[in-house]
Amino acid sequence: MSEGTIRINKVLREFNISLERAVDYLKDKGHVIESNPNTKISDEVYNVLSNQFAGDKGNKDASKEVGEEKRKEKEALRVERENEIEEKRKVDEERQRQEVIRAKAVVTGLKQVGTIDLSAKSVIKPTIIPGVKAEAKAEVKTEAKVEAKTEVKVEVKVEPKAEMPVAKTPEKSEQPKQHVAKETLVKEKIFAKEPAKNVAKPIVGKTPEATSKPSVEDAPVDETHETKYTKLTGPTFSGQTIDLSQFNKPKKIIEPNKGGAKPAGAGNNNNNKNKRKRIPTKSGEANATPRVPGTNLIRPNTGGNATGGGFNRANKPGFVKGARPAIVPKVEPTEEDVKNQIKETLERLQGKGNKSKAAKYRRDKRDTHRQKSDDEQRELEAGSKTIKVTEFVTVGEVATMMDVPITKVIGTCMSLGIMVTMNQRLDAETLTIVCDEFGFEVEFITTDLEENIEVVEDSAEDLVHRAPIVTVMGHVDHGKTSLLDYIRKTNVIAGESGGITQHIGAYGVELENGQKIAFLDTPGHEAFTAMRARGAQVTDIAIIVVAADDDIMPQTKEAISHAQAANVPIIFAINKVDKQNANPEKIKEKLAAMNFLVEDWGGKYQSQDISAKTGIGMKELLEKVLLEAEVLDLKANPNKPATGTVVEAFLDKGRGYVSTVLVQAGTMRVGDYILAGKNHGKIKAMQDERGNNVTEAGPSTPISILGLAGAPTAGDKFNIFADEREAKAIAAKRTQLMREQSVRVQRHITLDEIGRRIALGQFKELNIILKGDVDGSVEALSDSFSKLSTPEIQINIIHKGVGAITETDVMLASASDAIIIGFNVRPAGNAKQLAEKEEIDIRHYSIIYAAIDDLRDAMEGMLSPEMKEEITGLAGVRELFKISKVGTIAGCMITDGKILRANKVRVIRDNVVIHTGDIIALKRFKDDVKEVAKGYDCGIQIKGFNEIEIDDIIEGFTEVAVKRKLK
């Protein structure tokens, strides 16, 4: 990027404005820039935008700051919420851990049962069990420090006595000791943690410790050891019964344990879940160490001794193997918990829960796709109501793009007061109005082209008077060309085929007084509507020629409508007044009925009775033309590049493409670069209507030029450029646009069209390649041929152009199965031999009537014939003869016409047709006959119908194919 410049898209982001807003504001301030985000602007333009839109920048910055503050607030709230959740989680974990600890403390407190009478400890001597010393040491390590010290002292005193063998203990005392030890062991396994599993072992050895010296340390032992209930597991027997149900109460909590770890010794039997079975052991097994939980053979990845093994509670955090799950007291829910629970319930009911994030993602994705498809459909529907057109679009192309019958488009234009034809081009304003009538919007794509053509503004001192441009219009054979022949002192009619004008002519005439007039001669045939419309658009004054011995004809009315649409003055020339049956007053009366009151009758329209053959009234007519021109005060600037309109174009075999143009402003010179439509070139030569070479042509001058690369379309505007590159660039762009337009106009066959053709049954197409000598004639023929199309036969003009018939045209006709029509042209080169080889039909015409009539006849020949019924005779039933295995025979008398054996018949009863069929047999007496005439009787048997009755009428008829005519 060069210093001092900046791209406008960066400025737009800085000031928070749109590109259109910036471009419009700069345009108002006198700075015209391209509407492109990558356009570079200078510091001066930047300052202009800064002065205007600094407020928008401030608003954007303020909005950004507010957005940043909101983002920070949201982030702080999110962090605070996460901290609260984390803190709450820690509190819950701590509370759960405390509950577990409290539960353990409560369970161990169950040992403090004060209902056991210890007075019997002096009666029964203690039984010393070997191995108590080692187990006692293990207990010392698991107890608290204070308890450990106390029990160590006791063990020192008791140990010598423990070594003494005591064998006189009764056998019955063995069972209570074993019973109490096992019971205590079960309790410890259920409620204690894993390190406390061995606590039950030394309890057996503590009993003799307490009973060994009751008199020496009676009080201290009671203080320290009564709360531990070390006497419960002693071997002494007091004779009292201990209620074990108080120790079995917590077992109810174990019932929900499904698949988890079971208490030691429970095994895999489901019957042991509720109550443990007591198994008495032998004396030799009394000292056996109880099985430690977890020592069973357990397979990997299973749930221990639990049934099923599918759920392993050991994976839970805080789980202690061998201990019961903690009893967590029910906590009263807080208000926040209640709100969260209600919110989760509502979300589940509304389908917004978090039970499946994947399902929610898929649902949101479906909604997004559905919304996107709906938006695309709406855009497509909106786009279908918008048509993109260029300045070259015609009425037929517009009708095709809107998919509207062309007759409706032409009718709409006529209702707006615009007389148009199928191939006539519409200006932007008219096109917008017409499309709006059908609910379409028009988008023009050629605005950038007009900006490249420099328009020179005319100053008052540069304007000079120019000659008027006069167009002569009227019905065919009313004398338009004869009028110009008399004025120009020439004989144009002799050169026209069939004595009618088929080309638009442009002539310059200099009168005796030195004044000049430019005349345009338009054809009067109905096919040349477009030519008349072009003549009216470029003219200053219109002369409507009406034959005094004729009437106001359709083309006369059309010419008047064209002149009115172009808003040009009208002069009526009533011709052929020299004839005996001429009646000019009748013509004026008809004009008055059309709201055209001539001056002779007190109106504002000028009229003149003339005779183009004898010259009657010609001088007065020219004077009225000059008077009208003087009133109009026509001026133009000759000191600028020429602009004007293409009147006609044709291909001259020796000179190339020749274009007849009418200069409306400026001056055209040999050597100038010209652009007309999509064609461009350098002017090589200029000639007037008489073939004289000229070097320059000023305003209101009709001239023929050579040098264009192709034949421009009649009606195109032309411009003169000083630089060939500029003209070539615009021509290339227009060619591209016209190609795009042709593709846009193409319509492929639709399903509805296929259905319509199938419904018709006999749908046919006629493809035509049309070549002519001049563009105006080609356009007129194209219009006329297209109007001949019917619902059953469609005319497709697949190609039309100016020039000779070439081999390319023949190959195109062969590929598309088309016929070639040449109007005043012949095949070039080997085109004729190729057409004979490919069996392509080439038709040549020089009169437009003949071409249209031949095509109409060809279309009528393509039409399927129409079947009509002709009644041949009537027969009355007089008698019936019923024959078995044959059927019913009707004895008839022919009352009208004749009945033929090949006829179809109808059976009519009480003026109602009850059957239609064929005749199987027609006999007269016993002979088979082909026909029976009126007045004779006969026997008739009808196929498949035996319900005939007397007095029925049999009507014989035949179907005849009749050639159809185009409507």
From Swiss-Prot:
Region (G2): 499-503
Region annotated Disordered, chain positions: 201-320, 349-382
Domain tr-type G: 465-635
InterPro entries noted in UniProt: EF-G-like_DII (IPR053905), IF2_II (IPR044145), IF2_N (IPR006847), P-loop_NTPase (IPR027417), Small_GTP-bd (IPR005225), T_Tr_GTP-bd_dom (IPR000795), TF_IF2_bacterial-like (IPR000178), TIF_IF2 (IPR015760)
Region (G4): 575-578
Pfam families: EF-G_D2 (PF22042), GTP_EFTU (PF00009), IF-2 (PF11987), IF2_N (PF04760)
Record keyword Transcription present: no
SUPFAM superfamilies per UniProt: Initiation factor IF2/eIF5b, domain 3 (SSF52156), P-loop containing nucleoside triphosphate hydrolases (SSF52540), Translation proteins (SSF50447)
The keyword GTP-binding appears for this protein: yes
Compositional bias annotation for Polar residues: 233-248
Biased composition range(s): Basic residues: 354-363
GO cellular component, one term: cytoplasm
Skewed-composition ranges (Basic and acidic residues): 364-382
Chain positions covered by the region annotation G1: 474-481
Family: Belongs to the TRAFAC class translation factor GTPase superfamily. Classic translation factor GTPase family. IF-2 subfamily.
PANTHER family: TR-TYPE G DOMAIN-CONTAINING PROTEIN, TRANSLATION INITIATION FACTOR IF-2-RELATED
Role played: One of the essential components for the initiation of protein synthesis. Protects formylmethionyl-tRNA from spontaneous hydrolysis and promotes its binding to the 30S ribosomal subunits. Also involved in the hydrolysis of GTP during the formation of the 70S ribosomal complex.
The protein's name in its UniProt record: Translation initiation factor IF-2
Source organism of this protein record: Flavobacterium psychrophilum (strain ATCC 49511 / DSM 21280 / CIP 103535 / JIP02/86)
Gene, per the UniProt record: infB
